[in-house]
Amino acid sequence: MQTSGNYQPVPIGFTVPSAPPSYEEATFHHPPYPPLHQGMDAKNMSNPPYIVQPVPMQPPVTVQTVYVQQAMTLYDRPVQMCCRSCNSMITTRLEYSSGALAWLSCGGLCLLGCIGGCCLIPFCIDSLKDVDHYCPNCHALLGSYKRI
């Protein structure tokens, strides 16, 4: 018979591999545990000590609540607001002081010829003065209103 292709005859002494091992042969059997020694009693054996390590404690976090008060525009009239100093609800107390508008009005009157004391009239008119707002309870300055 003639062989075609790259087939070669089986060499002499070659054995065909056998089937895989059976399930019993393939599973590994663990050896049994050794029996307890006669001198040892399982009831009296103590477990190794259980060491508990303390959990590291974090310092408590303190939260500070900050109330942001919107900038209040102050005018020449009393304003009802919460005092930043004593935290009470108040109506501001007004104090008038001579500001730039009073001095410019005085200078303008001097230029017009009102030298004989009439140029001091702007210092008597509250609507030409700057206004300071104070807390009536703690007397803290809460803000100012500048005319110029």
UniProtKB/Swiss-Prot annotation:
Location of this chain's protein in the cell: Cytoplasm; Nucleus; Lysosome membrane; Early endosome membrane
Pfam families linked to this entry: zf-LITAF-like
Motif PPxY motif location, chain numbering: 20-23
A GO CC annotation given for this chain: cytoplasmic side of lysosomal membrane
UniProt superkingdom: Eukaryota
Binding site for Zn(2+): C83, C86, C135, C138
The keyword Nucleus is assigned to this record: yes
UniProt domain LITAF: residue ranges: 63-147
Keyword 4Fe-4S: no
Topology with respect to the bilayer: Peripheral membrane protein
Gene Ontology terms, MF aspect: DNA binding; zinc ion binding
Keywords: Cell membrane, Cytoplasm, DNA-binding, Endosome, Golgi apparatus, Lysosome, Membrane, Metal-binding, Nucleus, Transcription, Transcription regulation, Zinc
Regions crossing the membrane: none
Location of the region described as Membrane-binding amphipathic helix in the Swiss-Prot/TrEMBL record: 101-123
Annotated domain remarks: The LITAF domain is stabilized by a bound zinc ion. The LITAF domain contains an amphipathic helix that mediates interaction with lipid membranes.
Function: Plays a role in endosomal protein trafficking and in targeting proteins for lysosomal degradation. May also contribute to the regulation of gene expression in the nucleus. Binds DNA (in vitro) and may play a synergistic role in the nucleus in regulating the expression of numerous cytokines.
Family indicated by similarity: Belongs to the CDIP1/LITAF family.
Listed name of the protein: Lipopolysaccharide-induced tumor necrosis factor-alpha factor homolog
Species this chain originates from: Xenopus tropicalis
